[in-house]
Amino acid sequence: MAKKVTAVIKLALQAGKANPAPPVGPALGQHGVNIMAFCKEYNARTQDKAGFVIPVEISVFEDRSFTFITKTPPASVLIVKAAGIEKGSGESAKGSVGSITRAQLEEIANTKLPDLNCSSVESAMRIIEGTARNMGVAVKD
């Protein structure tokens, strides 16, 4: 029989840099999870994605064991990195703070495709383009 899930915890952590300090320790500790085991496993799985924030969804079971799924980095982080800017615009309607090419947009869409609620790369590109526009980043042909 399958183990019963008692909690699902969602965190966004730096790739390869999870440690027992907040927010990881308190979030997992209250469910009785072995914090160091999670940190070691998460760091091992994400060490090749250094520099990105990687969202993770942790399922905690009755016997205090756990499994977790790592997601792709947030679209905004990928857009900022591609545009080579520090952060998006506070007032996106007034002007752009940077730009990305269609090729970069397609690359980001391909990266995000497994986590987006769509099936084609074209629709993923439209979603990412909307995110970029809201951040004040122009998409150039």
Curated annotation (Swiss-Prot):
PTM notes: One or more lysine residues are methylated.
Role, per record: Forms part of the ribosomal stalk which helps the ribosome interact with GTP-bound translation factors.
NCBIfam families from the UniProt entry: L11_bact
GO MF entry, a single one: large ribosomal subunit rRNA binding
Quaternary structure, from the entry: Part of the ribosomal stalk of the 50S ribosomal subunit. Interacts with L10 and the large rRNA to form the base of the stalk. L10 forms an elongated spine to which L12 dimers bind in a sequential fashion forming a multimeric L10(L12)X complex.
GO biological process: translation
Gene coding for it: rplK
Family in the record: Belongs to the universal ribosomal protein uL11 family.
GO annotation, cellular component aspect: cytosolic large ribosomal subunit
Domain of life, per lineage: Bacteria
Pfam family, one: Ribosomal_L11_N
Keywords, in A-Z order: Methylation, Ribonucleoprotein, Ribosomal protein, RNA-binding, rRNA-binding
Source species of the chain: Synechococcus sp. (strain RCC307)
Keyword Nucleotide-binding (UniProt): no
Name of the protein in question: Large ribosomal subunit protein uL11
Disulphide bonds in the chain: none
HAMAP family cross-referenced by the UniProt entry: Ribosomal_uL11
